[in-house]
Design a protein with these regions (language model features):
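Conserved short hydrophobic patches within well-ordered secondary structure
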Residues: 23-27, 46, 88-93
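Generic hydrophobic/packing signal
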Residues: 35, 47-50
């Protein structure tokens, strides 16, 4: 079995910051090492628009660390950054609610349908590596 393109997606876990960073760094290092051995020609990773501006969040620090590993590797790559998915809105609202109080984020939110992101990732994966970041919003 051989692969010319690898897609990665990491789910946000409700875990401590250290665990998230460690998971994304370890899994990304392992994946990149195996891709190098296999001669993979295109690593595609899904990330979030604004990651570099939200480093006070452990999740976004972890995503930034993941992106840095990818950009620092020898594997040609495309990082696809998207806004949060419409499908996550209920979970975000539930997480932000305590009793009858809702904490509103200071960040702007511009959700996108997961299907639209999947289509964009597919198009990018089938193309040549951009060795950079593509934003889908």
């Amino acid at each position: 079995m051989s692969f010319s393109t690898i897609l990665t997606r990491s789910a946000k876990e409700r875990a401590c910051i250290f665990s998230i960073v460690k998971f994304l760094e370890t899994s990304t290092r392992n994946l990149l090492a195996q891709e190098a051995k296999a001669g993979v020609g295109h690593h595609v990773a899904l990330s979030v628009i604004g990651t570099e501006r939200m480093l006070s969040s452990g999740y976004f620090r972890a995503k930034m660390a993941q992106e840095n590993l990818i950009t620092g590797s020898s594997i040609p790559y495309s990082i696809v950054r998207a806004t949060q998915f419409f499908e996550f809105v209920k979970g975000i609202a539930d997480f932000s609610t305590e009793g009858n109080k809702v904490r509103l984020p200071s960040a702007l939110i511009q959700p996108i349908a997961a299907d639209d992101v999947a289509s964009a990732v597919g198009r990018i994966a089938m193309g040549s590596p951009v060795n950079g970041t593509v934003e889908v919003d």
